[in-house]
C-alpha cells in the first residue's frame, strides 16, 4: 500500500459551541494498553461480517502486514467497548512516529482507503475512527461540543477555572474571577466539556 494521504487530526473547531455536556461513560471496561502498543478504536465496521475484514498495517509497526489481502489483523479478534470495536497494534520501537493502515476485506478491497496516525507524543497510545473512518487522536466529541483539557504537572487544580462566553449555550455565570471549575478528570488532566 502507498503512504497514507490522510493524517490524524484533532476534532474540528466548533464555532458555535452549544452547552455543557457530560463526558461519555464507559459501560464495558477496556483491558489496559500494553507498552509500545497503539489501540485503534473503530466506531463501526464498513461491512457487517467482521470475520471477513481486517486491519492492514505498515510503517512504524512491529510486524507490517504481509500476504494481501488475508494477512491483515482480523476483526474477528477485535474487542468491543462503549465506542465500538478496537484492536491493539504493537509498535516497532519507542521512536515510532507514524502508523499507516487501512481496513480491507478478504476479497482484497481497500474499504477505507489508506489512513495514518501521527504519534503526537511518546505517551500517545490510542486513536479513533468515526463512522466515516476519519482518524482522530482523541475520542470524537458530540456534535456541537468542545472539550478543554487542562494539565498541571503539580496536580494542583484548586481555584483553577475556565471562563467561556460568546457563542455558547451556557456562558460562565460566576463573578470574575470565579469561572467554571475543572472537576472532571481524564487521560489528559482535568477537563470541561462545553
Walk through the language-model features, giving the residues of each.
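Exposed beta-strand face motif in extracellular beta-rich ectodomains
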Residues: 97-101
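Aromatic-rich carbohydrate-binding modules that target alpha-glucans
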Residues: 48-94, 106-114, 156-194
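Intrinsically disordered, low-complexity repeat and linker tracts
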Residues: 2-32
Amino acid at each position: 500500500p502507498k503512504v497514507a494521504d490522510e493524517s490524524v487530526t484533532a476534532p474540528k473547531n466548533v464555532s458555535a459551541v452549544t452547552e455543557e455536556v457530560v463526558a461519555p461513560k464507559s459501560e464495558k471496561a477496556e483491558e489496559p494498553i500494553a507498552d509500545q502498543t497503539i489501540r485503534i478504536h473503530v466506531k463501526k465496521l464498513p461491512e457487517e461480517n467482521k470475520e471477513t475484514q481486517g486491519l492492514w498495517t505498515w510503517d512504524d509497526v512491529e510486524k507490517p502486514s504481509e500476504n494481501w489481502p488475508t494477512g491483515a489483523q482480523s476483526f474477528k479478534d477485535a474487542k468491543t467497548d462503549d465506542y465500538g470495536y478496537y484492536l491493539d497494534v504493537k509498535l516497532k520501537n519507542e521512536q515510532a512516529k507514524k502508523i499507516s493502515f487501512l481496513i480491507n476485506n478478504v476479497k482484497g478491497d481497500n474499504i477505507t482507503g489508506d489512513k495514518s496516525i501521527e504519534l503526537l507524543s511518546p505517551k500517545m497510545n490510542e486513536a479513533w475512527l468515526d463512522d466515516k473512518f476519519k482518524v482522530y487522536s482523541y475520542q470524537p466529541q458530540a456534535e456541537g461540543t468542545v472539550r478543554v483539557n487542562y494539565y498541571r504537572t503539580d496536580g494542583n487544580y484548586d481555584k483553577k477555572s475556565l471562563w467561556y462566553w460568546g457563542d455558547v449555550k451556557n456562558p460562565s455565570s460566576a463573578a470574575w474571577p470565579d469561572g467554571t471549575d475543572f472537576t472532571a478528570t481524564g487521560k489528559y488532566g482535568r477537563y470541561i466539556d462545553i
